[in-house]
Amino acid sequence: MMDDAADQHWMRHALALAQRARDEDDEIPVGAVLVSADGQVLGEGGNRNLSEHDPSAHAEIVAMRAAGRALANHRLVGTTLYVTLEPCAMCAMAMIHARIGRLVYAASDPKTGAAGSVFDLLSDSRHNHRIEVLGGVLGDEAGHMLRNYFRARRGKRTVVP
């Protein structure tokens, strides 16, 4: 398990990826970085589903695909995935299949969150793998970025934290 400083460091990295996805591609600002047990970046990315016309190109999937290519392995054992928004069911199940060790997320997703908000797929005893979960790391910052993105898309003024 990493310490609070490491979790915040990597979450800030994920927030920067989310901001880049928003600024460069007008994507929903979600960023993810997959880190090895010894602190090496294995894969990272922001949401790409709008720009690539791919409903599966969520930030988590982008990061896991990059890590799988880098390691030449579909198993990502012992890794930690940092993501700015609680994963959906698709991403959560991909994490289980990849054998991710730990998930750290920023903002909860009360509509589609699958790490405890709506569903709790990651600790379901029916699966052959469980993932340690820590939520709320820099959650206010991530939530603010997401709310302002959607406010701007709806033609409303953004809100300063």
Describe the residue ranges of each PLM region.
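Zinc-dependent deaminase
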Residues: 1-21, 90-161
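Short beta-strand scaffold segments in enzyme catalytic cores
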Residues: 30-39
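A short, polar/charged loop-to-alpha-helix boundary motif
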Residues: 51-62, 66
